Amino acid sequence: MNIQRAKELSVSAEQANVSFQGMPVMIQHVDESNETARIYEVKNPGRELTVPVNSLEEI
């Protein structure tokens, strides 16, 4: 996924179909300078991760 699309999805009111390593996730924040995204698992919102934006996949 590219940074611009990740930013669009992070501010969208609708739940996006995004996955990280096969897990459905939500994007909380995108850090353009580091090209990373703060995400959490849909099924486990308490598990937050910072991952490279290019490791996210829109499904």
From Swiss-Prot:
Keywords attached to this entry: Sporulation
One of the Pfam families matching this protein, by short name: SspH
Protein's name according to its UniProt entry: Small, acid-soluble spore protein H 2
GO cellular component assignments: endospore-forming forespore
Stated induction or repression of this protein's expression: Expressed only in the forespore compartment of sporulating cells.
Source organism phylogeny: Bacteria, Bacillati, Bacillota, Bacilli, Bacillales
Family: Belongs to the SspH family.
Originating species: Bacillus anthracis
InterPro entries: SASP_SspH (IPR012610)
